[in-house]
Regions:
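Structural motif
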Residues: 58, 89-98, 354-355, 403-413
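An anionic, glycine-rich sequence signature occurring as long contiguous blocks
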Residues: 8, 12-14, 19, 37-50, ...
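Dynamic "connector" segments at or just before major functional cores
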Residues: 2-202, 208-247, 450-527
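Basic, amphipathic alpha-helical segments enriched in Lys/Arg and hydrophobic/aromatic residues
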Residues: 399-462
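Domain-level cores of phosphate- or acyl-group-handling catalytic modules
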Residues: 228-285
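Short amphipathic alpha-helical "interface-anchor" segments enriched in bulky aromatics
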Residues: 117, 181, 372-415, 419-426
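Short secondary-structure boundary/capping segments
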Residues: 189-194, 268-274, 291-297
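Short, conserved catalytic/metal-binding motifs centered on acidic residues
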Residues: 70, 102-103, 117, 137, ...
Length: 527
């Protein structure tokens, strides 16, 4: 009886708590999750048979080989990695090329987080083009950036940024300065609530940047805490950069918005005999000057709907009178009362007297030796300096790659600027007509499936392009590659800086060789 009772209780205990569906593999078709052969996949276009292939050496960055050739021809990548102050001591530490190359691949692909490095982790073809052994993990990339001493990293990165653009400064050029804000989320060092027009009240970092106008090349970037967005925090690094340049390579002028139109910045420019063009805030004295000029008359046409006139003013805190340019244009403003009293029928057909004309004013302080119309045009063209901010933040990663400490944020900001400069120059070499943003150039000049094969000691890459302009892309790349290969094979006696100079001369031949006629404006500020 005891044995029977034990058997019945065991059966009851097994049925009281059913196991549900049990092991999922037991109800799936046999070996379906580990199928050795092709998997049938039904789609709207019919059935496809899919099979994984982890052994074929392939890359989604098929055209990376041409960019690697560009960096090698000028010695940019080798010198950059060789000088990196990592200070590795362990024999198991990754190479400089592995760490920097992993980040470079991620940046080139438009990633914004260290975790995105995993997307290129098992590329079996592209890493070798940059002398890499492997793509390191996200943790390794983030952790190894901590090996840098902040000052050593600053000197190393500024040196190589300078080597990228220094030869171009032998031509007359204009320098644009501006500040952008990077919103951060969390408890990062320097995450302070300061000026943040897009997300007020959010902590941020301030990026003080310096540009070669029109060429959209970044001279340098300084990352500061969120409350240090004022120009006074970014100008010391700029003066350090300018003072290190030979006099003949200094800018023909400096342009900045109203955040830079202070007495201190003007005095610093005047001390160095560098002309400036700064926008001024419309204080009471400036508004009185505008009223005086309106009564006085004598406005001249400056193009694009602008009119201009010049005068002199000495604001409170200024040491002397300075020349100012006042520009105005008509703008239409809505009349709320007219909109409120309008009939629905007139509203539907847009026949409303709801707009009145008034003037919008821009006041500029300048020591540049140009007329009113030229100065208004120069400042209007400064709007082009806003475009690189949008590109670097939304297409290159300036809005990401955030770490707890601000030093690594600074290193990655400069690294992104370096990769951006190299890629921009490469894109101009392939197509010198104009600057094109990464959202356009990546699909054209980086995408494509590359399949690598090796035979008889030769490595061959077969590239398949899916771009609609593939024929044009192939022709331009063939021309650029032939030029670079000629430098590598026939100019072996030249040093890396000399070869890089030849590359820059090829890219900017329309700026450097045929000088602008009948104008005194800086060559690299117009075009």
């Amino acid at each position: 009886m005891l044995a029977v009772w034990l058997m019945e209780s065991k059966a009851l205990s097994e049925t009281a708590h059913p196991v549900g569906e049990g092991n999922l593999e037991s109800i799936l078709p046999e070996n379906s999750s580990k199928a050795a052969g092709p998997m049938p996949v039904d789609t709207g276009g019919g059935r496809y048979h899919v099979q994984w292939d982890d052994s074929a050496p392939m890359t989604p960055l098929g055209q990376m080989v041409f960019f690697a050739q560009f960096l090698h021809a000028g010695g940019r990548w080798e010198d950059f990695c060789k000088d990196a102050p990592f200070g590795f001591t362990s024999p198991n530490a990754p190479s400089h090329e592995d760490v920097l190359g992993s980040l470079a691949f991620s940046i080139l692909c438009g990633h914004t987080r260290y975790a995105h490095v995993n997307a290129v982790r098992f590329d079996a073809v592209s890493p070798a083009m940059l002398g890499m052994n492997k793509v390191v993990s996200e943790d390794s990339a983030r952790r190894n950036l901590k090996k840098f001493d902040a000052m050593e990293a600053r000197q190393w990165q500024r040196k190589h940024l300078r080597e990228t653009w220094e030869r171009l400064l032998c031509e007359p050029w204009m320098l644009d300065i501006d500040t952008t804000v990077k919103t951060v989320f969390g408890h990062q060092e320097g995450a302070e609530v300061g000026y943040n027009p897009h997300k007020p009240g959010r902590p941020s970092h301030a990026y003080h940047t310096y540009w070669i106008a029109r060429l959209r090349l970044c001279l340098d970037v300084e990352v500061r805490p969120g409350k240090q967005s004022s120009s006074s925090y970014g100008m010391p690094a700029l003066w350090e950069l300018i003072d290190s340049l030979p006099v003949e390579c200094r800018p023909q002028g400096i342009r900045g918005d109203c955040g830079y139109g202070s007495e201190a910045n003007m005095l610093a420019c005047e001390k160095r005999n560098i002309p400036y063009l700064f926008k001024l805030r419309q204080t009471v004295k400036i508004k009185n000057l505008i009223s005086l000029m309106e009564r006085q008359g004598g406005w001249v046409d400056c193009g694009q709907g602008f009119e201009g006139i010049e005068g002199e003013v000495r604001l409170s805190g200024w040491s002397r009178q300075r020349r100012v340019i006042i520009a105005r244009r008509l703008v239409k403003k809505e009349n709320p009362e007219a909109t409120k009293n309008a009939t629905p029928l007139l509203t539907h057909y847009g026949m409303l007297p709801v707009e009145s004309e008034s003037h919008e004013y821009i006041v500029l302080a300048s020591t540049m030796p140009y007329g009113v119309d030229a100065l208004v045009r120069l400042y209007r063209e400064r709007g082009d300096a806003e475009n690189p901010f949008d590109e670097l933040k939304n297409q290159w990663g300036w809005a990401g790659f955030t770490t707890q400490d601000i030093d690594r944020c600074q290193v990655t900001a400069r690294l992104i600027a370096q990769i951006y400069n190299w890629w921009s120059l490469y894109a101009r070499l392939v197509d010198s007509e104009r600057h094109r943003e990464a959202v356009t150039t990546r699909p054209e000049l980086l995408g494509g499936v590359g399949r690598q094969t090796k035979h008889a000691g030769q490595t061959q890459i077969n590239i398949s392009l899916t771009h609609s302009k593939s024929n044009s892309i192939k022709a331009k790349l063939a021309e650029a590659s032939a030029f670079l290969q000629g430098l590598i094979t026939t100019a072996e006696q030249l040093t890396n800086p000399q070869r890089w100079e030849l590359i820059l001369l090829r890219i900017f031949e329309k700026f450097i060789q045929p000088k602008l006629q009948n104008t005194g404006l800086p060559t690299l500020a117009t075009g």
